[in-house]
């Protein structure tokens, strides 16, 4: 099963419908034969761990899942993979959000009083570089192409260097970006997950 973890943060109302459904990702993956679950993240959660707990509660009982996370959803998905490694078979980090962006950090601080914990991390918010280097599951990284201020190429490159055995999937614009087309993403995901 593919579990899609949407992006977005506290500056705008983004849910699974806006991020995955409307752009055609969920339907496209199902048409390609994938079993797909796209839960909404816990919006305005005070920590990445709280988001991970929320996601864990949405996971079905049964076999391990493949987490496909977009943008800031990568931090929540990584926290889940670290907290419950027996539930996660592999991880796709698509369009990982660049940490240390002053504009985004200011928006988070304004919206969430506990922002310090949300902004902490190294390459990604909510996860230390040592935790990334300690991952022991298959990880694929899909960069934003072209890059933008929130999804920089350097973040994807740093993840590929830090995570043992991480592979790069072909990049594409992120949803709900107007240039996004679901077909390249669906092909990359179905090709990598088998």
Labelled PLM ranges:
Residues 23-46:
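Conserved alpha/beta-hydrolase
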Residues 49-65:
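Conserved acidic catalytic loop of the alpha/beta-hydrolase fold
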Residues 68-77:
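Gly/Ala-rich beta-loop-alpha elbow adjacent to hydrolase catalytic centers
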Residues 78, 82, 91-115:
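Flexible "cap/lid" loop of the alpha/beta hydrolase fold
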Residues 135, 141-143:
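Short beta-strand/loop motif that positions the catalytic acidic residue
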Residues 148-155:
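Conserved alpha/beta-hydrolase "acid-adjacent" motif
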Residues 164-194:
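Catalytic active-site module of serine/aspartate enzymes centered on a nucleophile-bearing elbow/loop
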């Amino acid at each position: 099963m593919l579990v899609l973890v949407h992006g977005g943060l506290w500056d705008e109302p983004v849910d699974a419908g806006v991020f995955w459904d409307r752009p055609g990702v969920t339907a496209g993956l199902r048409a390609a034969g994938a079993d797909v679950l796209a839960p909404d993240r816990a919006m305005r959660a005070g920590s990445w761990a709280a988001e991970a707990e929320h996601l864990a509660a949405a996971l079905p009982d049964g076999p391990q899942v493949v987490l496909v996370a977009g943008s800031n959803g990568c931090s929540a998905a990584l926290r889940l993979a670290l907290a419950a490694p027996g539930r996660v078979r592999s991880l796709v980090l698509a369009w990982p959000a660049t940490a240390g962006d002053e504009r985004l950090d200011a928006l988070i601080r304004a919206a969430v009083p506990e922002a310090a914990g949300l902004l902490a991390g190294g390459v990604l918010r909510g996860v230390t570089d040592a935790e990334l280097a300690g991952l022991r599951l298959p990880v694929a990284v899909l960069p934003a192409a072209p890059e933008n201020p929130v999804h920089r190429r350097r973040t994807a490159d740093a993840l590929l260097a830090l995570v043992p055995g991480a592979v790069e999937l072909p990049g594409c614009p992120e949803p709900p970006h107007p240039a996004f087309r679901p077909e390249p993403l669906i092909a990359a995901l179905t090709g990598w997950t088998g």
